[in-house]
């Protein structure tokens, strides 16, 4: 009986380790301009990432976009959002680059509740992706508190996929 237990134990151990060893993983890094400008994000850390996610793009109520100033909190370094992307890309090659669409600020609830604003927003995001040769978006929504907000958020996701198509990471 003891021998059978050992065989079963090692069988499950072998299967478990085999499955664990086959798992793929991905390392993502969020890049915030004010941290990058202050040297708080090392180039080595960025090079170790599979994809870089740039913060922060916010919607206005009508679906137009606002971008975080990368020089917030200090007066040095890159001065524009596009400059931040170019600066990082010059140092880090071969990673996927996305923009984060999160709910930390902006008029998300009003924008996703309006069909025309959702369409405008999705088209504006596509323009940003094309202009900056980005690979996709990272959705980071954590604020939906009721059924209507979940529905509106879902409609915004569907609209994003419809406008962006399959060529962008989502």
Report each predicted region and the residues it spans.
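Short, solvent-exposed loop/turn segments at secondary-structure boundaries
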Residues: 111-115, 147-152
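Glycan-recognition patch characteristic of GH18 chitinases/ENGases
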Residues: 22-129
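Short acidic, glycine/proline-enriched helix-loop-strand junctions
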Residues: 71, 75, 148, 166-168
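Active-site groove signature of glycoside hydrolases
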Residues: 125-150
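Active-site neighborhood of glycoside hydrolase catalytic domains
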Residues: 150-170
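Bacterial Sec-dependent N-terminal signal peptides
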Residues: 1-22
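Residues that line or immediately flank small-molecule/substrate-binding pockets and catalytic motifs
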Residues: 11, 56, 141-143
